[in-house]
């Protein structure tokens, strides 16, 4: 059950990873168009504008969050596969907290309906996993 749920999370994460670069370009282009519209007839330093757009694009980039999320998924699978008799429930709970944190940050940075739908799916599945993990030792 846990691995099935984790596979659903990974599928949604994969879709977000595929969508993220295009969404970043769309956001950058939309921002550039908005600034040009606002600055019509006003002298604007193109270099400064490019710098500001780059800073905003960096704030919208979810690559780091997705990378950390993927590493938490690997750690979760490895922990589930442990056969040394050590309790795994707490560790899995901590990993789920980190996954949820990355999902929340990704959602807040996304500003994209398609990506947000996948973030909601991830959060739903993480909650289902958490309910089951609470019963593990």
PLM feature segments, named:
Residues 1-137:
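N-terminal intrinsically disordered, cationic/polar leader segments
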